[in-house]
Amino acid sequence: MPEVATRSLPPVPQQEWISALPPAMRIILHGDVGARSVAAAVWGVDFAEQSCRATLKGARATLWLGPDEYLLLGGLDGQVATLETQAAEAAGALELALGRMPHALVDISHRQFALQVSGPHAATILSGGCPLDLDLNEFPVGMCTRTVFAKADIVLWRTQQDVFHVEVWRSFAGYVTGLLREIAVEFNGT
């Protein structure tokens, strides 16, 4: 599937509150606390101590999405020139370190597309399609979760007070960006 990496990304509205993020390395890890400890040492990022939280170190992050599910993101600085090679090397290093420990490790780098929604109305715009309470007190900086945006599954991560990282399946990217554009119409120019 090398051609997937060279496909053009879905059109993203040219508004300052939304932007397409560069391709990144994405690996899903399912494993218990022992696997998490080994993976953290290899990945170079400590895993969060609390569920639905993310940790970031340099250009890598870990998002705790479920009881034994973690999304590992790499190349968040946009410096993933050879995405496939880096993802394969990272997955190989993790697989080798985890050895015979019960775990599942899957490279999903090409499956997803990432958006950044930012600005003073970011939470309100996302609330137009997301059922979660995105008030800063309820969904603080560093929180992440699987949820939906209208009919699309997404991973939502609040990276700063008014900045959200949204992971969506590539096949739903046009749908999600279109809905974001419609919802944001009332905020144009503000």
Regions found by a protein language model. Give the residues of each.
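Basic, glycine/lysine-rich polyanion-binding surfaces/domains
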Residues: 1-190
